[in-house]
Structures are given as C-alpha cells and as structure tokens.
Amino acid sequence: MAKITIKVGSNLLVQQDGQLDKRYIVELCREIGNLMSEGHQVVLVSSGARAAGYGYLNKSNAQEADLYMKQALCAVGQVQLMKLYESAMSFYGIKVAQILLTREDFSHRKRFLNLRNTLIGLTEMGILPIVNENDSVATEEIMFGDNDVLASMFAIGWNADYLLLMTSVDGVIDQNGKVIPFYREDTTNMAIAKNASSRWGSGGITSKIRAARAAAAAGIQTSICNGKKLENIAQFVLTGQTGTVFERVGPIKAKKAWIGFLSKPKGSIFINEGAKIAIENNRSLLPVGVVHIEGDFQAGDVVEIRLDDGTFLGKGIINFSSAEAKKIVGLKSDQLEDVLGYSCSKVLIHIDNLWKRDN
C-alpha cells in the first residue's frame, strides 16, 4: 500500500471555452478509483475552482476581474467542481471529502497536526480527500501562490510515498525540446525552457520544480509529468519513473519536515562561522555563536538561521523571545541566567528542533 498525492492544474481541468472538462475529470477519477481499489491511499490536490465559477456563471476575462470578484467566483466554482468529483467517484463506490486550506494551516503546528489527523481518518475510511487552496478567504500574506506548492506541502505533511505534479507537457523540458528524465541538484545550471502560466492557472515550471525539490528533499518520490496521459499515474506508482523524476532524499523526521518545509519563520538568527560548523556537526545552536537578531518572535516560534553574510542555513524552534535573544547575543551559556535574571535554557535552538538546509 502506498500513499499517493496527485496534483492536477486548471490547464488540465478546463477547456478552451472556460468550461470544466467533464470527460477528463471522469477519466482521472477512474485512474484514482483503480489505485484505491488496489489498497492505495490517494489525496487529490485539484485546481479549477475559479475557472469553474467563470464557466458556471458564463463570465469571461478571467485575468481582469478584481480580487473580490475572483474570490466570489471561486466560492461558486468550488461547489461545481466538487459535484463533478463526487459524481465521478460514486461509480467506484468511493466517497469524497473537501479540504480547503490556507498557508496558516501549515504554519501553526497544532493546526497542522489537527489537519494531519483528519487526513489520516479520511484515508483510513477509504474516502478520497480533495484539497484546494481556500481562495475565497486567502490574502497575499496567507496564500500558497499556486497549488504546486500546496501539493508539495500536503505530501510532506502526510508523509506521502509519491507526489505527481501533473501538467500539460511531458515533464521538465530543456531548451532543445527534450524531456529531462531525472532532475538532480548537481545539474541546477541545466538549460530549462521557460513556460508561461496558463490562462486559468497561476504556476509555471519554475514553481513546479521548487515544489518537487522540496518534496524530494523530504523523502518523497516526485514526478512532474503529463497529466493528459493519465496512464502516467499507474506507471509512476508501479515503476517510479515517468516524466521528470526528482529522486527522494532522506526521509527526515516529521517534526523536522514541518520545521523545514511547512513552518513560517517569524524572524532570523545570524550566526558566525564557528556556530555554522557546530550545527553542521549536529550540535545545538548556542547564544555565543550569534551575531545578530532580526524579527519579533516568541519562545517556541520558528526562525531562520543565517550566516552573518545572509546565507540561508536552515530553520529551528527557538527557546527565547526576540527580546530575550537580543540580550544574550554572543554570551556564553553560563552567563545567561545572570543577564536575564531567571533560570533558562542553555541553548538557543536545540539540535532536535533544528532543520538544516542540506537535510
């Protein structure tokens, strides 16, 4: 049994006239039904609400509408989209559930854990969770930006085995028009052809690559592949190969995956070279290695860890508020209680609560 996250974008779900492609949705649900009948657990991350709203109300000029109008039409379209999924999955005796999220649902660990428990309950009951960004309430500060990022974060939070980011081309295409079968971090200078966002979608290939890299770094076998060829889904689960594959790294523990990929940092800790070497050797971050503090945060918040030149090194859960941390910058651990005036932790960020960029 495998845990599979599938993301389909608006460019696959919507026809040129702006109407939902009902035939495609039925065929997609057939592939998902086959996987679930084999005992696999599946989560579908589906775009298309805004396009469905425009189509249902016979509106046009998708990119020209004001934000409030787009959000209103997303609310209308989400209902139509779920009706289609519910109807199509009923042919396989499978019920569906709707999950609408914003970035904040992942940034707060308690909410994230509640979300994960809900997801576990749904999949254990044989229900297909259908996930989308809550476009009707999302603002710029709490938006994912596109569903590629949402799918990646969801797969990481669920500890999925596979993530398929399905698009309208065969994978990541180089400038010669050929598919790159395997994407590796040592080939970051490879020539990748640019592709624009679709009329109805918000993400291009750059977004998909960023999302795929994050999932692979968390131990998830990931592919960017052609969603028009729905047989790619079963092929990837069976062979681990289709489209452009991002080989899994890790896995890492769930808590560190949340810190590294799902949390939203509240500030930044700038450290010296000695502290950098210490955390590279799996040692906790001490105040003596800190040179500068930025941001307003409380004890228990997630902060970025950067070298004093600004180089990003990782993230961690800090044991002090920003006000406290600024008082103990550069101090040795045995000086902390004298400066603060009360008993406190000797470490700024414990290694168990620290995610390194190279994890």
From Swiss-Prot:
High-level lineage: Bacteria, Thermotogati, Thermotogota, Thermotogae, Kosmotogales
Keywords: Amino-acid biosynthesis, ATP-binding, Cytoplasm, Kinase, Nucleotide-binding, Proline biosynthesis, Transferase
InterPro entries, A to Z: AceGlu_kinase-like_sf, Asp/Glu/Uridylate_kinase, G5K_ProB, Glu/AcGlu_kinase, Glu_5kinase, Glu_5kinase/COase_Synthase, Glutamate_5-kinase_CS, PUA
Similarity section: Belongs to the glutamate 5-kinase family.
Cystine bridges: none
Binding site for ATP: K7, S202, G203, G204, I205, T206, S207, K208
Pathway named in the protein's UniProt entry: Amino-acid biosynthesis; L-proline biosynthesis; L-glutamate 5-semialdehyde from L-glutamate: step 1/2
Xref: Pfam families: AA_kinase (PF00696), PUA (PF01472)
NCBIfam families on file: proB
Full protein name: Glutamate 5-kinase
One BP annotation, GO: L-proline biosynthetic process
One Gene Ontology cellular component annotation held by this UniProt entry: cytosol
